[in-house]
Amino acid sequence: MNPAFHPSTPFIQEEQTLTRRIFEEKRYTVQGHILPRDAFFPMGKRDWRPTAENAARLISEAETILTEDIPTLLATDYASFRRTGDRTVFDRKYQERRKMCLALALAETLEGKDRFTEKLADVIWAMLEETTWVVPAHLSNPAINRGDPERPVLPYAWKGTADYIDLYAGLSGAVLAVSLYFAGGALDRFSPELRKRTEYELDKRILTPFLDRSTWVASGWQGWDGVHPETQTPANNWAPWITGNILTVAAFCEPSLARREEIVSAALPILDNFTMCYGADGACEEGPSYWAMAPGKLFGACELLYDLSDGYLDLFGDPLIRRMGESETLLSVTRRRFLTYADAFAGLKANVGLLARYGERCRVPQMIAFAADRSADGSGAAQDLYSCWDSPYDWLCNLAWEMPQNVPAYQPPTRVLLEDFELFIAREFAESERGLYLAVKGGHNDTSHNHNDVGAVSVFADGQPILLDAGVGTYTAKTFSPERYTIWNTRSDYHNLPTIRGADQKQGREHRAVGFCAGEDSCSMELREAYGDGAGIKSFRRTAALRGGRVTLTDDISLSDAGEVVFHLLTDTKPTDCAEGSFRLHGRLLTYPAGLTMTVEAVEHSAPETARIPVAWGVPTLWRVNLTSAAAKEHHVTVVIQ
């Protein structure tokens, strides 16, 4: 029977401190509360099984895998990232091995005929023989290259014990742990040595280095009280994501109860380091695409800890955890579009299984209604067999999950204010495909997966983008290098923000909005600091409003010396009906001061970092409208969309 829908009291009004260490607050005692290995079962169910539909899909997937070759990982594949900056050559084949492993293991468990055992043994053996489970894009970390200034092309891990765990090493460990748990008996019939070797590698590559605190400063992802002591970078999605997968290895494979407790005790402060970086509004600064990889991964770790402690470690009622979940639903523009900021992907689909499970556990009805709405019309990712596979415990939960029945209809809010993150959203109607939609972002230019986008606005009309944030493209070596802000989609002049006397916004926490203020239908802020002193800006006040069936964007700029200002507008369609002081986008009229000079350009997207951006928006190219104001000390420009 499907679980019932549970209404709950709205929690948005609850008091909340800004910086919280939730596990520490609750004074949990780990010792004596962690289940031994033989008493732990996925989701607390000894007879865990996927839904009938997913069971059939797993069998079918495994049958297909039987006809396929296991991808070969070559030295030249690993070296390609260092040589060309391309991450996909190695990563695609690497990930395919791990998906094969999971599908074969569960299919063998479901069928029990040894039809998939030998192929599974081959895949596991191939993974065990990999020199390192760390992917080449993360090889530059000092913990794995031992400070080699030349940035090695190939890993050093063959020299001795592993001392670094990245996202993909954690994933690999969890994949093998889950596979061994479910298909261990079949693998033992093939060769008991395979289990022994797998357990040896899991201890060597995952559990032992995790418990060695001497590696933590170099690797950095653990958070260190929220901020890394050397780089001063805050904890991001790596903290809950890797921690959740390490906990999966411990839960399924670690035989010593004392060591299981030690691993959990080490994990809880890391998760607290992550929650310390969230404001009371629960907003994910990394962008909606990273919600599943940040708050979603925290939820997954909490779900595993709940099951591993037989319900003792329970954060599901905490208001911050609930807000972190609900925040994703607040960022939906239409059924098929999320708001893009930071490294958000314009083609993102809602992870309906994760959203609904989060909502059920934390009793947030809005999340369940949102997920059901996206599932019903096919705009969510419910049909993906591998949804959440990069955290295998989450994947198991998703495979066994069914959408609850009799869920009330979802209705988007007409106003959203995330005060700590500084994001204001107004919607003309409580319908996702009707009327005008306005989003305005404040904040600072030093977020995780940062774009220089302080003061950026996004506008939609009847579900169509009028002014947009392009979002993320494809990661390459350049993406996370000093050249990041040479990529156009990260720069302020492609975020509906002006270039002032030739200057655009700068990266850094000091480059931020000041005096962010939101009313019922408008938002304003001072943006001088976002550009820095070199721009010669005395004041730059931006105000955006949605009222009376129109969006009004007003920039008041005062300069120390006369200078030219170019107001940039980014859209997905070429302007039509262009006249002095006006043009149309998707049928909507945009007006601007007639004294400005308008030019239109197709946005270049041939570089590998940006090639997929127009595709995500469903168009051949994006367009940028440039409105140039003559040199002056004072600039007052209002753009109206109606």
Predicted regions and their residues:
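Non-membrane alpha-helical segments in proteins
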Residues: 96-110, 122-126, 170-178
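Structural helix-adjacent loops and short alpha-helical linkers that scaffold large soluble proteins
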Residues: 108-121, 179-203, 250-268, 305-321, ...
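Solvent-exposed loop and edge beta-strand segments that line ligand/cofactor-binding
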Residues: 29, 34, 85-97, 109, ...
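Long, well-ordered core segments of solenoidal/helical folds
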Residues: 62-73, 120-138, 194-225, 262-282, ...
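Active-site lining segments of carbohydrate-active enzymes
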Residues: 151-287, 300, 394-408
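Extreme N-terminal leader/anchor segments
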Residues: 2-55, 103-109
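CBM-like, beta-strand-rich accessory domains located in the C-terminal region of large
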Residues: 2, 139-143, 170, 374-387, ...
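Carbohydrate-active enzyme catalytic cores, enriched for enzymes
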Residues: 295-467, 518, 525-526, 614
